[in-house]
C-alpha cells in the first residue's frame, strides 16, 4: 500500500517498536517509518492510503486500525492510544483528522 513511499524494512521496524499494548507513540512511529522526512506530496499520498473509506478524513475507527494499514498482522490500537492520537491530530475539534492536520501531525 505504501510502495514507492515507505521502505518495507522501516515499516517492519516501526511496527516492532510498538507491538506492546499502549506503547504506540505517533511521533516515534512517523520518524521510524520514515514518514516525517518525506515530502508534503508523499505525506499526502500516505494520508489517502490510511483514509480507508476515502472520506477525505481519518476518523477514529480508521485510527484504531492504523497499524493494520501498514501490515495486516499488526495489532489494533488500544482505546487510550486511539483517543490520544485523535486528540493530537484533530486541531479543529471536528472528531477527525483532515489531510492538512495529518501533515502537521507527521511533522510534529
UniProtKB/Swiss-Prot annotation:
Q: Where does Ca(2+) 1 bind?
A: 51, 53, 55, 57, 59, 62
Source organism, top-level taxon: Eukaryota
The residues that hold Ca(2+) 2 are: 90, 92, 94, 96, 101
Q: Which molecular-function annotations from GO does this UniProt entry contain?
A: calcium ion binding
Cellular component aspect of the GO annotation = cytoplasm
Tell me the residues on which N-acetylalanine occurs.
1
Q: What is stated as this protein's family in its record?
A: Belongs to the parvalbumin family.
- Additional comments on file? Is regarded as an important allergen. On the 2D-gel the determined pI of this protein is: 4.14, its MW is: 11.53 kDa.
Function statement: In muscle, parvalbumin is thought to be involved in relaxation after contraction. It binds two calcium ions.
Q: What protein name applies here?
A: Parvalbumin beta 3
